[in-house]
Amino acid sequence: MMTLKVCPSLLLLFLVHSVWTRTVRQVYNELDPEHWSHYTFECPQECFCPPSFPNALYCDNKGLKEIPAIPARIWYLYLQNNLIETISEKPFVNATHLRWINLNKNKITNNGIESGVLSKLKRLLYLFLEDNELEEVPAPLPVGLEQLRLARNKISRIPEGVFSNLENLTMLDLHQNNLLDSALQSDTFQGLNSLMQLNIAKNSLKKMPLSIPANTLQLFLDNNSIEVIPENYFSAIPKVTFLRLNYNKLSDEGIPPNGFNVSSILDLQLSHNQLTKIPPINAHLEHLHLDHNRIKSVNGTQICPVSIAVAEDYGLYGNIPRLRYLRLDGNEIQPPIPLDIMICFQLLQAVVI
């Protein structure tokens, strides 16, 4: 009999990833009521209502300029790729079961969102407003939200307390907006006690954001202008597992001696920065991306989380450093790979130079 061993970190990645990649059908199967027969099967003429999926309404890619009246039976509403500018209360009067709204790629502005219309959708779990014309995070929001996607808008402001009641939110995506450091205050993310993924990539940040929720597992800060990691910054987010800081302005001087020596971090991405040496890492780290920096040499003795002698004595089954993937291309390093790297990181499966 063959025994399959699953790496704990890969299992964690699978579990975290599954939270955000469930299909609509899977969510439907979990939440589907036992009987839909008491609802009439009306369908707006602009939309498509699949008989096999009676609580879904597909109005995407129809050139719509306004939201049609939503039947009471609908849980999943697809309105992406239209010309919609406003979200008013009238179309949602009967839509008391809505769980999922996709309004990506429209022309919605903050002024176009009627006051209180979103917060009245008491059962809404997933709200997609990517690729619109928003200049601030809309408020108030439904208190039961689990995912809020606001990428690729023009957001430069986050109203005070807008997230304070969103205790169930697990994912917040604000990437590719116009956020400055001043938009992220110490209490901006207060109340997001369940948050697992925070994406603030492709904004205009120069500093690490303040007061990241303590339960955050994935933090994406790529494509900003961050220069410094504050001392003990990650002690406030002790569960962070995946950290992306690619395409910033980090230098050796901007990283404290043990800035990334945090036991929870399994995947660390620092590509396209200004580093000349490899920063200290923890023994649990499995993936390290340092490509396209200014690194000229690699000293395994210096970067090994344990002494080389100890690593050599541990052997294959010992408590050795867990690094499996190391990317160093785009630097000034020439092959071959130093022997002390291989002695220290005995689980390495790939080194890209």
From Swiss-Prot:
<keyword id="KW-1015">Disulfide bond</keyword>
<feature type="repeat" description="LRR 6">
    <location>
        <begin position="194"/>
        <end position="214"/>
    </location>
</feature>
<dbReference type="Pfam" id="PF13855">
    <property type="entry name" value="LRR_8"/>
</dbReference>
<feature type="glycosylation site" description="N-linked (GlcNAc...) (keratan sulfate) asparagine">
    <location>
        <position position="94"/>
    </location>
</feature>
<feature type="glycosylation site" description="N-linked (GlcNAc...) asparagine">
    <location>
        <position position="168"/>
    </location>
</feature>
<keyword id="KW-0654">Proteoglycan</keyword>
<keyword id="KW-0964">Secreted</keyword>
<feature type="signal peptide">
    <location>
        <begin position="1"/>
        <end position="21"/>
    </location>
</feature>
<dbReference type="Pfam" id="PF13516">
    <property type="entry name" value="LRR_6"/>
</dbReference>
<keyword id="KW-0677">Repeat</keyword>
<feature type="glycosylation site" description="N-linked (GlcNAc...) (keratan sulfate) asparagine">
    <location>
        <position position="261"/>
    </location>
</feature>
<feature type="repeat" description="LRR 1">
    <location>
        <begin position="73"/>
        <end position="94"/>
    </location>
</feature>
<feature type="repeat" description="LRR 9">
    <location>
        <begin position="264"/>
        <end position="283"/>
    </location>
</feature>
<protein>
    <recommendedName>
        <fullName>Keratocan</fullName>
    </recommendedName>
</protein>
<comment type="similarity">
    <text>Belongs to the small leucine-rich proteoglycan (SLRP) family. SLRP class II subfamily.</text>
</comment>
<keyword id="KW-0433">Leucine-rich repeat</keyword>
<feature type="repeat" description="LRR 2">
    <location>
        <begin position="97"/>
        <end position="118"/>
    </location>
</feature>
<dbReference type="InterPro" id="IPR001611">
    <property type="entry name" value="Leu-rich_rpt"/>
</dbReference>
<dbReference type="InterPro" id="IPR000372">
    <property type="entry name" value="LRRNT"/>
</dbReference>
<keyword id="KW-0272">Extracellular matrix</keyword>
<feature type="repeat" description="LRR 3">
    <location>
        <begin position="123"/>
        <end position="143"/>
    </location>
</feature>
<dbReference type="InterPro" id="IPR003591">
    <property type="entry name" value="Leu-rich_rpt_typical-subtyp"/>
</dbReference>
<dbReference type="Pfam" id="PF01462">
    <property type="entry name" value="LRRNT"/>
</dbReference>
<feature type="repeat" description="LRR 4">
    <location>
        <begin position="144"/>
        <end position="165"/>
    </location>
</feature>
<feature type="repeat" description="LRR 7">
    <location>
        <begin position="215"/>
        <end position="236"/>
    </location>
</feature>
<feature type="glycosylation site" description="N-linked (GlcNAc...) asparagine">
    <location>
        <position position="299"/>
    </location>
</feature>
<feature type="disulfide bond">
    <location>
        <begin position="47"/>
        <end position="59"/>
    </location>
</feature>
<dbReference type="InterPro" id="IPR032675">
    <property type="entry name" value="LRR_dom_sf"/>
</dbReference>
<feature type="disulfide bond">
    <location>
        <begin position="304"/>
        <end position="344"/>
    </location>
</feature>
<dbReference type="GO" id="GO:0005615">
    <property type="term" value="C:extracellular space"/>
</dbReference>
<feature type="disulfide bond">
    <location>
        <begin position="43"/>
        <end position="49"/>
    </location>
</feature>
<comment type="function">
    <text>Plays an important role in generating and maintaining a transparent matrix within the corneal stroma.</text>
</comment>
<feature type="glycosylation site" description="N-linked (GlcNAc...) (keratan sulfate) asparagine">
    <location>
        <position position="223"/>
    </location>
</feature>
<dbReference type="InterPro" id="IPR050333">
    <property type="entry name" value="SLRP"/>
</dbReference>
<dbReference type="GO" id="GO:0061303">
    <property type="term" value="P:cornea development in camera-type eye"/>
</dbReference>
<keyword id="KW-0325">Glycoprotein</keyword>
<feature type="domain" description="LRRNT">
    <location>
        <begin position="34"/>
        <end position="72"/>
    </location>
</feature>
<feature type="repeat" description="LRR 8">
    <location>
        <begin position="239"/>
        <end position="259"/>
    </location>
</feature>
<feature type="repeat" description="LRR 5">
    <location>
        <begin position="168"/>
        <end position="188"/>
    </location>
</feature>
<keyword id="KW-0732">Signal</keyword>
<feature type="repeat" description="LRR 10">
    <location>
        <begin position="284"/>
        <end position="305"/>
    </location>
</feature>
